[in-house]
Amino acid sequence: MTIETRYATILLLLSGVALLSGCADDPPTPAEKAAAAAVPGAPPGGVADAEAKNAAASNVKESNDLVEFAYAYPREAAAIPEFAAWLDNDRATRRDALIATARRDKAAAEKAGFPYRAHSHLQTWQRVSSTPRFLSLSAEIQSYTGGAHGMTSFATLLWDRNRAKRRQPLDLFTSGEAFDSATRERFCSGIKRAKTAKGILVEEASDSPFAKCPPASAQTVWLGSSDGRYLDRMTIAIAPYEIGPFAEGSYKINVPVTGALVSVVKDEFKRDFLPIN
């Protein structure tokens, strides 16, 4: 073997070692993880767990002359199979309802000789917070089913990891009345401040439909966390027409998680809250 041949052979071997070393450092793909979880002796449910951990956020959109539909939820929800299944079913239910209403209204418009405007439902779930026990989601929904303008509404969901079940924030409290009593003062004063910030004079006439502060329990409650461990933040979303005319729009009122509020939390959930005082 000549010196040139020996040198070329050494270079080839070294490049092969480097290539193997580089391959060894590459992280396994989702498919490889799922395959590893499926081998004999792997823990039961390993394949499903591996697939769930690699689940992507869901975002379904549809737009045509009849409807505009969108429904999305984050990766954290997609990673919980039972929760994702419920969200997928909710999406299908809302889409079917939108299409049924749109077809009915389109037929009625054509019969009466009026133009039809596509109906819509646009809903995006977003993560509010994630603690060891709860995944908290919020949604702002834009919808249109005819008329002068569309509507804004809100939704809320909690996933209880300990019980593997879906909950509403008010499920964590002893009653809606107790929740209202613990939040009324801060909630109502928050509404007044929010209206003042918009330059709106707060109506106080007894005969005004918007003079009375509504019960917080009748609105949409979002529970959050500042540290990823405890529920210690709360926002109450108010849709248009609830406390003012449509032109005022919606409101989002931050209400502190006080000791008084935590005192009306059910015993099962008290350890998951952290009051500010």
PLM regions and their residue ranges:
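Residue-level signal for mature regions of secreted extracellular proteins and peptides
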Residues: 16-17, 206
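Bacterial N-terminal signal peptides that target proteins for export
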Residues: 2-11
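C-terminal motif of bacterial Sec signal peptides marking the signal peptidase cleavage site
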Residues: 19-22
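Compositionally biased intrinsically disordered regions enriched in Thr/Gly
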Residues: 24-277
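Short, functionally important structural connectors and interaction interfaces within domains
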Residues: 12-15, 165
